[in-house]
Amino acid sequence: MGKDFKSLVTRCIYVGKMNDNAKKLKIATEELKDLGNNVMKRVKLCEEQQQMKRLDKVQTWLRQADTVIKEAEEYFLMSSSSSSSGLISSSHKMEKKICKKLKEVQEIKSRGMFEVVAESTGGIGGGAGGGLTIKDSDEQTIGLEAVSGLVWRCLTMENTGIIGLYGVEGVGKTTVLTQVNNRLLQQKANGFDFVLWVFVSKNLNLQKIQDTIREKIGFLDRTWTSKSEEEKAAKIFEILSKRRFALFLDDVWEKVDLVKAGVPPPDAQNRSKIVFTTCSEEVCKEMSAQTKIKVEKLAWERAWDLFKKNVGEDTIKSHPDIAKVAQEVAARCDGLPLALVTIGRAMASKKTPQEWRDALYILSNSPPNFSGQIS
């Protein structure tokens, strides 16, 4: 009787420990599941929206997490069987297995707090902006190839870290920036870890710039929104200072304090680049651009070619009187690619001389405002 009672007490102790650890294992496993789902969401965001590739260590961790979760779930079933078996040895062995698996789950969970989950594909990354291919129109590139080529060469020069593109609105600065961004993403061996595109606009908002950069480098933190501007800057700096990046800033109206935003200054060591567009040459000076490139209006022949391409030869030749008026309409676009493309497309279906004369009259008396469109 005494021996049986002692055996019963021992069994109860082992079963109690086993059940306690089984509960802890279940809680830890659920937490690991949640963490794994969060990491996978971040990975998919980077892969699908920013054309990035998940880090090898993240892929390994996801695989390990999935395996240990399945094993833990099997242990839940085994612990139930062991509890009802009545065997001390069985309960004791199961309790030790569960305890070991609990430590394994906790260890894997502790390694899952990734700041960055993905990198550029083939050495180039980021999105879209940055890392994100920006929609471009082939028709708008006529006459801008030389400027795009110059910016591209600057990206390979060691003594040029900050490049400023300036010129009047509608002259094609954003088109050039888009071409360079997309070319950088398409060519896989240029050595940039992140290619980041940020639209700045007239109303400068430093935290908005920080939030855009944070999304494009794949850093997602639930506490991000509660962080101060300085804390966000420190986290961005921590990540970008270890990587080579190309940062494209479109539509800059005033000096952007990039250091305050957390962006490390480009230098010979990090070999990073910053390229921005602005209407003001003064902003180029304020941004400490080592290279300033003025984007000029198109010469007449280039302007006329671009206009004709968007109108279509069929329309221009549809009536003998249209060609001359069409040239006058194109001249009113003042060599601005945006105006030439927009008005050219609008006139593509106009095949009577009167429609063209009406358009010329409107342009002569109230030139269109292209503010807010591609500049």
From Swiss-Prot:
GO MF annotation, one: ADP binding
The UniProt record lists the keyword ATP-binding: yes
Any GO BP annotation: defense response
Alphabetical list of PANTHER family matching this protein: NB-ARC DOMAIN-CONTAINING PROTEIN (PTHR33463:SF220), NB-ARC DOMAIN-CONTAINING PROTEIN-RELATED (PTHR33463)
Species per Swiss-Prot/TrEMBL record: Arabidopsis thaliana
Organism taxonomic ancestry: Eukaryota, Viridiplantae, Streptophyta, Embryophyta, Tracheophyta
Protein's name according to its UniProt entry: Probable disease resistance protein At1g52660
Pfam family name, one: NB-ARC
SUPFAM superfamilies: P-loop containing nucleoside triphosphate hydrolases
